[in-house]
């Protein structure tokens, strides 16, 4: 229901938008990130609190990102990995349900922890996480049905910590 309302805020759809519902200072917020200004009238009408939505230009923040800079972060993600099938191509997608284990164990085929997932994403996307400040703040399973009736279960993991930019272009 809520996902559909967010998607309709960007019609006609031209680019991908990232969003999440977050708790900040004891209040629930919808945080959106997109290259387009959304039409939030449907969301306000259906779920609004009476307060007008606010938008901010993201460019000034992006301009401050440079190699070696450090940032506090909170990321709510669906950490997954794909198994390889008998033909050697991508098989099933699995949730990273293991929280942690020694790195040597984690590197075995078919193993991926929630901490290992964020480390691998960091490497691909131009940042490193401070292992001493990395925390899994919340783990939650979500279940819903697709219009076809197929049941879907997703694992949501909230990561918090400090990241350091290693490649500003890849990060942005």
Regions found by a protein language model. Name each.
Residues 1-172:
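RNA-interacting cores
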């Amino acid at each position: 229901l809520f996902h559909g309302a967010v998607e309709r805020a960007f019609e006609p759809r031209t680019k991908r938008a990232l969003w999440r519902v977050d708790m900040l200072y004891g209040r629930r917020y919808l945080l959106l990130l997109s290259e387009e200004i959304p039409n939030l009238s449907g969301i306000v009408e259906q779920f609004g609190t009476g307060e007008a939505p606010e938008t901010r230009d993201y460019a000034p923040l992006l301009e401050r990102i440079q190699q070696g800079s450090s940032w506090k972060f909170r990321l709510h993600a669906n950490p997954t990995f794909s198994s390889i099938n008998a033909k050697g191509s991508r098989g099933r997608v699995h949730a990273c349900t293991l929280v942690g284990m020694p790195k040597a164990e984690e590197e075995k085929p078919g193993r991926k922890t929630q901490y290992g997932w964020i480390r691998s994403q960091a490497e691909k996307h131009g940042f490193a996480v401070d292992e001493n400040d990395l925390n899994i703040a919340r783990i939650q399973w979500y279940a819903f049905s697709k219009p076809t009736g197929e049941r879907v279960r997703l694992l949501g993991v909230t990561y918090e910590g400090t990241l350091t930019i290693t490649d500003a272009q890849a990060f942005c």
